C-alpha cells in the first residue's frame, strides 16, 4: 500500500521542462555539486528530476592559458589557448558521457562564452556527446558608456538563432538580472527557437574589507531573498509571454 502511495505521488509530480519529460520538477542547478558523474548519480538516487552540469566557461579557459603563458611569447599564448580549449572541452564532453552512462534522468549541459563562434561549436560537441539539452549561461555586465540600447538583448537572440541552426536538442537560456524588462526578450527567445528560459543567474557579488580597505568577493552562497525577484518575473512571464 505504501509503495502504491509513493508511486502515485511521484506520478502526480511528473512534468515537462523545455520539452524534456521529468519525473518531478526538482532540477539540480549548475555548480561544483554537478561536476562529476559520481555526484550526479547520487542526485538521481536522491530523487532529482534532472541535472544541469557545471558550466564550461570560455573566459576561464583563456584566463588559464594566459596564466600558463606568463612571461613567454605571444605566439605561445595562441598555442596554449588552443591546447587549453581542446583539453577543457574534452574534459567536459567526458563529463557528459560519464554522467549519461550512469544516469537515466535528463542531463543538461551548460556553457558560458563571449564569442558567438564558441557558443556554436561547444553546443555542437555537447549534443554529439549525448547531452539531453543545453543551457546557455549568458552572464555579462554591460559597463560601456557607448553602449547602444538593445544591443545586449539582440546578442542573446543571435546566439540562440545560430545555435538552433546547428543542434536539434532543446536550448535553454539562463538570463541575468541586469535587464530593464525581461519579458520582450523572453518572447523573442522563444520565437527564435529557445525551448526554455531560466530566471535569474546569480552573479558574484563584490565587497570591501573595511580593515584592509581591499576589494574582494562578497557572499558566495545565496539565500531565500534571492527568490523574490525571480518569482516576480516568472509570474509576469507566465501570464504575459505567449506560449
Region roles according to the model:
Residues 6-27, 92-100:
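N-terminal amphipathic alpha-helix/helix-capping segment at the start of soluble metabolic enzymes
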Residues 79-90, 110-114:
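Short coil/turn segments at secondary-structure boundaries
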Amino acid at each position: 500500500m505504501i509503495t502504491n502511495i509513493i508511486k502515485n505521488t511521484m506520478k502526480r509530480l511528473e512534468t515537462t521542462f523545455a520539452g524534456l519529460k521529468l519525473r518531478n520538477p526538482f532540477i539540480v542547478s549548475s555548480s561544483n555539486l554537478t561536476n562529476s558523474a559520481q555526484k550526479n548519480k547520487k542526485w538521481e538516487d536522491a530523487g532529482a528530476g534532472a541535472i544541469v552540469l557545471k558550466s564550461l566557461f570560455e573566459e576561464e579557459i583563456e584566463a588559464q592559458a594566459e596564466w600558463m603563458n606568463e612571461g613567454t611569447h605571444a605566439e605561445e599564448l595562441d598555442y596554449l589557448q588552443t591546447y587549453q580549449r581542446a583539453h577543457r572541452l574534452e574534459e567536459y564532453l567526458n563529463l557528459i558521457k560519464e554522467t549519461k552512462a550512469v544516469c537515466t534522468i535528463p542531463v543538461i549541459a551548460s556553457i558560458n562564452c563571449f564569442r558567438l563562434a564558441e557558443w556554436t561549436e561547444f553546443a555542437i560537441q555537447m549534443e554529439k556527446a549525448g547531452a539531453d539539452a543545453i543551457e546557455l549561461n549568458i552572464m555579462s555586465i554591460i559597463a560601456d558608456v557607448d553602449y547602444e540600447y538593445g544591443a545586449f538583448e539582440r546578442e542573446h537572440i543571435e546566439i540562440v538563432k545560430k545555435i538552433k541552426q546547428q543542434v536539434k536538442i532543446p536550448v535553454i537560456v539562463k538570463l541575468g538580472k541586469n535587464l530593464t524588462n525581461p519579458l520582450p526578450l523572453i518572447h523573442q527567445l522563444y520565437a527564435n527557437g529557445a525551448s526554455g528560459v531560466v530566471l535569474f543567474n546569480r552573479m558574484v557579488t563584490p565587497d570591501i574589507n573595511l580593515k584592509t580597505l581591499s576589494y574582494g568577493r562578497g557572499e558566495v552562497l545565496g539565500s531565500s531573498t534571492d527568490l523574490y525577484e525571480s518569482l516576480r518575473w516568472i509570474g509576469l512571464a507566465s501570464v504575459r509571454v505567449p506560449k
